[in-house]
Amino acid sequence: MRVHGSGVLAYFLAATVVAISVACSTASEQTAAAASTNGNPGLDTLTKANALERVVERTPPKPASGGTAPSFVPDPGWPKPLPNNWIIGDVGGLTVDSHDNIWVYHRPRALSSTDAGALGEAGKNAKGQPISAIGHPRPYGQLSGCCVPAPSVLKFDKAGNLLQAWGGPGDPGFLEKRCRPGDGCYWPGREHGIFVDHNDFVWISGNGEISRGTNSGEYPWAANFGGDDSQILKFKADGTFVLAIGKQGMTKPNSNDTNGGINGTPQPYLVADFTVDPKTNILWIADGYGNRRVLMVDAATGKYIGHFGAYGQNPVIGESTDPAYGGAWAADFRKGETKPKYFRSPLHCAELSKDGFLYVCDRGNNRVQVFKASDVGKPCQNPAGEAGKCGFVGELPIAPQTASGTSGSLAFSADPEQSCLYVADLTNFTIYSINRKTLQEVDRFGGGGRGLGQFHWPHKVSVDSEGNVYAGEVDGSANVQKFLRYGAAGCSGTGHAEVGKYRQ
């Protein structure tokens, strides 16, 4: 049953949504008490109840007629403030592990010089000029008292407590002692993609390119990563390096490579994201910004298992560097060419459902393609994009009228059937709730803005076992939010056949 307005508040209080109640209670009651003595009538009216109601009103449900979906409200107390004067940059990756811990993988080098003003001189650039650990000029040393970049990998519990932090330029000594080129470990130039598998191994990658300036080479540790990001790294949960797939420093794609990496592993290029199947221990890789394929490897050894492109085709046709297989989605859309035979950069996610279907975010083509996981990866031709061939099941356009970049990330609801598909639309700043059976939009939440419950480029979405949704943002937003689920546990009924149609 769906409730709205003051009914939402009543539902919350009846259901005792503890996380929000705790976040809003003590502070607002103390504030109200203090206000009665300082003469501020506005604060006199700020009570636990109406503070909660104000939060609820920020994310009203927008259900489709005939459809049912979970509703969400942002948790203003998640995560808790970071220690050590730390600050995070853009969120390149985010995942929830099997223990309901939330892992955030951020980009310290996305922080501006003033954001990371507490960093002093850490080395010299090629011109002998003093710079900070993330490459900003420091001719006079430290700029200010706030702040310093947190380590790139942050682990939180559901209450928002920070449990672990390691890796990257925000972790002094890590790049010199724990992720060393001599061991085959090159920390990414630009953090992108994290997953924690059923054995608690942490997988990360990156999409930095020296040729395009996203690896500037200015950092004191720049020799650690060489050329463009072209590795997938596997760590233990404490940050101990285990395995590398691919070799670092590639400068062009090869979407049909099977063994060009170190130790006989295949060669990825500018990887976006990945997931591991706990039943088969296959690592499914969205490969990605440079290559245009889904790559399959053994998660224990990194050895090649299979790969495929759009519509399940193997070999993959065309490369992102070939003008005949590129260009702008918007131009093709205007010409009515809405079924490209290739993934268009970036191929941004690969997520596996419990019932054996692989959902792939073809962000460059504003669509999600669906495959039967057991039927892909082998040589197969499907130039017409026929369902039932090469493991291809179907595809779902996501706001196809948008210039580019809608299908950025997706996750499944926590009900046993995983009946909802949550798709984060980067460009329209929205998360769609989609009935996975009908592929119709039954609700949406978010919307553009910088405030609580709003998004600017929701880059990654993930879900915990209670159905709460976590979203990380990029493009200067440098934000991660938790949305508490209430109401329905899953999606059902009919909705909008056109997912992402512009609506007020």
Give each language-model segment a name.
Residues 42-76:
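Blade/loop signatures of beta-propeller domains
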Residues 82, 91, 109-199, 449:
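Blade-loop segments of beta-propeller domains
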Residues 86-97, 148-151, 171-201, 251-282, ...:
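Beta-rich, blade/repeat-based domains predominating
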Residues 101-103, 201-203, 282-286, 357-360, ...:
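Conserved beta-propeller blade signature
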Residues 108-110, 208-209, 289, 364, ...:
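Residue-level signature of beta-propeller blades and closely related beta-rich strand-turn architectures
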Residues 150-154, 230-233, 293-295, 367-369, ...:
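A short loop-to-beta-strand structural motif that recurs across blades of beta-propeller domains
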Residues 357-371, 394-443:
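Loop/turn-rich, solvent-exposed surfaces of beta-rich toroidal or solenoidal domains
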Residues 456-504:
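Blade-level signature of beta-propeller repeat domains, shared across WD40, Kelch, NHL, RCC1
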